[in-house]
Amino acid sequence: MSRKPLIAGNWKMNLNHYEAIALVQKIAFSLPDKYYDRVDVAVIPPFTDLRSVQTLVDGDKLRLTYGAQDLSPHDSGAYTGDVSGAFLAKLGCSYVVVGHSERRTYHNEDDALVAAKAATALKHGLTPIVCIGEHLDVREAGNHVAHNIEQLRGSLAGLLAEQIGSVVIAYEPVWAIGTGRVASAADAQEVCAAIRKELASLASPRIADTVRVLYGGSVNAKNVGDIVAQDDVDGGLVGGASLDGEHFATLAAIAAGGPLP
């Protein structure tokens, strides 16, 4: 099955709302509309930027979509500092990242919490981008495939087969995030193919064939072409390279098979 690539730019804790507007405008200017027929493009700004991004996207009728970097597993209530899926849906978000390695590492989030957040996202009509990935010691020990499959199972626990069909999976080897090191295209394919095989077991082969599996970890315009050319890699979760509007647009154009005439 042909799956439309998704290029999602995770801004992490960068850019205030004024800077967010400038970056989205730069991306929109640098990536002509014709590319959006071949690639879905999303930005994932900090919470404080979302309303500004929504206003710009809606006002200028941009084909760019956007999402949030996290959400609460709770719908509302006395959870100081949490942001609910309902709030994100009202802000027009299409996606929400759950289980990013930085959340797992710095906030001690485990698979059970990630699964709860994914379920909450789906409940509110958001597409969760469920992140999994291994540290360098696991990779060097040759246990990277088994590690990712175990993390995948835990992070999707409790979801029905049809719900699994509504998620995006992002494979992000932790040792490649922000380091300049990048898994080879073959490395990415190995794990992403194993992920798809496990999705077929958890849901069905039909559903597994529809789920987009992204690669994340020092993705840039130089390597994205080789990565998305792999059979089971359907795009990228882009970090630092997404903060440069022109570079990010170039990256998305390559993922679309461009440059287009």
UniProtKB/Swiss-Prot annotation:
GO terms for biological process: gluconeogenesis; glyceraldehyde-3-phosphate biosynthetic process; glycerol catabolic process; glycolytic process. CDD domains: TIM (cd00311). Keywords: Cytoplasm, Gluconeogenesis, Glycolysis, Isomerase. Substrate binds at N10, W11, K12, G178, S218, G239, G240. One of its GO terms (molecular function) is triose-phosphate isomerase activity. One of its GO terms (cellular component) is extracellular region. Its main location: cytoplasm. It comes from the Bacteria. It is found in: Cytoplasm. Pathway: Carbohydrate biosynthesis; gluconeogenesis; Carbohydrate degradation; glycolysis; D-glyceraldehyde 3-phosphate from glycerone phosphate: step 1/1. The active site is at H100, E172. Involved in the gluconeogenesis. Catalyzes stereospecifically the conversion of dihydroxyacetone phosphate (DHAP) to D-glyceraldehyde-3-phosphate (G3P). Belongs to the triosephosphate isomerase family. Homodimer. This is Triosephosphate isomerase. The gene is tpiA.
